[in-house]
Amino acid sequence: MMAAPRRPFFRRRKTCPFSGAGAPKIDYKDIKLLLRFVSERGKIVPSRITAVSAKKQRELARAIKRARFLSLLPYVLK
C-alpha cells in the first residue's frame, strides 16, 4: 500500500507590523520600538526576518540611524 503524497509545508507570510489600523508610528525617539528591530549585536534586522514592508523598512532604518546619531541608541551592543 502506498502512502498518500505529502503536501509541501507553506509557512504563512507574516504581515507588516507597521501597516493596518492601530499600527505604531516609526519615530526615532521611540527607543523601545526600535530595539525590537535591532539584533543583539546592534545591527538592523533584515525585513525578510521581521516581515516589515520595503517602504517601512527604509523608514525604520532611517529612524534607527537618526537615534544612533543622537546617542539614543548605541551603534554596537555588547
Swiss-Prot record:
GO terms for molecular function: small ribosomal subunit rRNA binding; structural constituent of ribosome. It comes from the Bacteria. InterPro entries: Ribosomal_bS18 (IPR001648), Ribosomal_bS18_CS (IPR018275), Ribosomal_bS18_sf (IPR036870). Part of the 30S ribosomal subunit. Forms a tight heterodimer with protein bS6. Belongs to the bacterial ribosomal protein bS18 family. Binds as a heterodimer with protein bS6 to the central domain of the 16S rRNA, where it helps stabilize the platform of the 30S subunit. This is Small ribosomal subunit protein bS18. It comes from Rhodospirillum rubrum (strain ATCC 11170 / ATH 1.1.1 / DSM 467 / LMG 4362 / NCIMB 8255 / S1).
